[in-house]
């Protein structure tokens, strides 16, 4: 099946969020199971640098000016680049300038992305014609609208990575974009008097997916729907809304071949984990003690990530003799709070403000518990890394966290299902009780190792997601 992924970023060439990780891994996994997956992306400077060797597929003029469509290969995956320097030759963030002002021509920049996607389903490339156009987030949302306007020449799938960003622009741009005027309708791409590229993707796609089954249900509610819960509920009732879990890229995140850690290990040879733990304690200037549980948190320091919940009950970790290590940056008041906590407990708490890729890998490899107490989390990746590395996730029951971590209740441990720790309510006392359960299990090392083994046996690789998407494509 010929699948075209339409996106505005992909790892490792250009990344601002989790969307890039998905598009950087899913097409290769799809190729591995027999689908012919390719990528369409604007030719930003970072993309050009990563794919310097291309051939011209087509040249044309349309509402966006003069455009050249090019084709190259990156890590074995075919990539179409939309070469329009007047729109895309801007360094840095693909969406806004250095002062965080959205580019005024974003409606045109991402309108062109959707338009080219639809044309690749109509034969713009003589040698390859998309059978499925799989658009990602609002930037690619108009692809589905253009396909609908052109008679549905291909199946259309739209994946929500972040529902909060809705790509809203003035209604006057509709005619310039070449879309039918009657699409500007509540039963169309209109949202509160504006064009919404996100809503276009939702309304006109054959199938809408998001990054976990639980989050797919949550976004049909007022709490998580960002004003689109009515449309999303309708899609759910029509069986046009599904959740497909993100995967983990084993070439980057696997304890047996992780390029960033010194001591590799695997399920039947775990000595390297203890060595990584000692290195981690040294890195954070904490006492090197193998007998205390190490809690790690790698996150943006925001309330959404539940950082404030943790800080209100971090004393539970300290008082029971555990160690807490935090890596991240974000809200200034939370940064001040974590720094204060570390200053008060220099033998128990270590903090690194900022981001450090090698350190994040060492924390996952050397920790015993990875904390993800988010208020909401569409999918989450750090808990998946924790499972793979035998660093038990402690998570709140929401979104993808609920779909990927099984609580260490007595019943689940006995049935060999338990893989971590789960709490329900976004309240400090609920998290405190969960931390107490961690220490209880830690005191029973044999049982701890059993849970750790089950955690490491879980398979959340991209191949699983690729098969799930193949099934969805065939259902359309």
UniProtKB/Swiss-Prot annotation:
<dbReference type="InterPro" id="IPR001296">
    <property type="entry name" value="Glyco_trans_1"/>
</dbReference>
<comment type="similarity">
    <text>Belongs to the glycosyltransferase 1 family. Bacterial/plant glycogen synthase subfamily.</text>
</comment>
<keyword id="KW-0808">Transferase</keyword>
<feature type="binding site">
    <location>
        <position position="15"/>
    </location>
    <ligand>
        <name>ADP-alpha-D-glucose</name>
    </ligand>
</feature>
<dbReference type="InterPro" id="IPR011835">
    <property type="entry name" value="GS/SS"/>
</dbReference>
<keyword id="KW-0328">Glycosyltransferase</keyword>
<keyword id="KW-0320">Glycogen biosynthesis</keyword>
<dbReference type="GO" id="GO:0009011">
    <property type="term" value="F:alpha-1,4-glucan glucosyltransferase (ADP-glucose donor) activity"/>
</dbReference>
<protein>
    <recommendedName>
        <fullName>Glycogen synthase</fullName>
        <ecNumber>2.4.1.21</ecNumber>
    </recommendedName>
</protein>
<dbReference type="GO" id="GO:0004373">
    <property type="term" value="F:alpha-1,4-glucan glucosyltransferase (UDP-glucose donor) activity"/>
</dbReference>
<dbReference type="Pfam" id="PF00534">
    <property type="entry name" value="Glycos_transf_1"/>
</dbReference>
<dbReference type="GO" id="GO:0005978">
    <property type="term" value="P:glycogen biosynthetic process"/>
</dbReference>
<comment type="function">
    <text>Synthesizes alpha-1,4-glucan chains using ADP-glucose.</text>
</comment>
<comment type="pathway">
    <text>Glycan biosynthesis; glycogen biosynthesis.</text>
</comment>
<dbReference type="Pfam" id="PF08323">
    <property type="entry name" value="Glyco_transf_5"/>
</dbReference>
<dbReference type="InterPro" id="IPR013534">
    <property type="entry name" value="Starch_synth_cat_dom"/>
</dbReference>
<dbReference type="GO" id="GO:0005829">
    <property type="term" value="C:cytosol"/>
</dbReference>
